[in-house]
From Swiss-Prot:
Cystines in this chain: none
Protein's recorded name: Uncharacterized protein ML1222
GO CC terms: plasma membrane
Family note: To M.tuberculosis Rv1591.
Residues spanning the signal sequence: none
Organism annotation: Mycobacterium leprae (strain TN)
Keyword Transcription regulation attributed: no
Length: 198
């Protein structure tokens, strides 16, 4: 009976590990465009006013708590990427025969490409919707001293290299953490993977 079961398990065929990992990377890269589109749809724009003072100087200010959207919009992007990272890690863990460091590397690369794609698509879509705002170019006159303007939401907290890198690396770190927790919770040395015929 044991010999019969062992032969059945070894006869299970599965796709090559490299092909599956490349599929995960490409799938996550494509998902980045969807994440960027969703972010551009839900990210709140920033409403501001531009006006002339009595001395003729130009100034601007944000309405109410609109300046908080400089923080809220990038947090939305990180939140969407975090949800995707957790979901992708759990789904990748379900591919039992491909569990291991190769899958973690594939997840990390795919999620970094996904984050970069989401940021690029999101920035492009909000730029197409709201345009680039230059406070000094808003037309004002002494008859119309105040103008209401809308500024596109930012994708990143700042445009420094560190902030951009943190946003791109964030989902890869979350995915690695979730995958590590799943691996640590598994009591088997082979991570519970099934044997496949290659």
């Amino acid at each position: 009976m044991t010999e019969h079961c062992a032969s059945d398990i070894s006869d299970v065929s599965c796709p090559p590990r490299g092909r599956v990992i490349v599929g995960v990377v490409l799938g996550l890269a494509g998902t980045g465009a969807l994440i960027g589109g969703l972010w551009a749809w839900i990210a709140p724009p920033i409403h501001a006013v531009v006006g002339l003072t009595r001395t003729g100087e130009r100034g601007h200010d944000y309405l109410g708590n609109e300046s908080e959207h400089f923080f809220v919009a990038p947090c939305l992007m990180l939140g969407l990427l975090t949800v995707l990272a957790v979901t992708a890690s759990v789904l990748a863990w379900q591919l039992r025969q491909h569990r291991g460091p190769g899958m973690v590397i594939g997840l990390a690369i795919g999620l970094m490409i996904c984050a970069a794609t989401a940021a690029a698509v999101g920035a492009l879509l909000v730029w197409m919707r709201y345009g680039a705002l230059n406070f000094d170019a808003v037309p004002l006159s002494y008859d119309h001293k105040v103008a209401h303007v809308i500024q596109a939401p930012p994708v990143f907290f700042a445009h420094g290299l560190l902030q951009v890198a943190a946003t791109v690396l964030w989902p890869a770190g979350i995915a690695a953490l979730v995958y590590a927790v799943l691996a640590a919770a598994n009591g088997r040395d082979d991570l519970g993977g099934r044997l496949c015929s290659r």
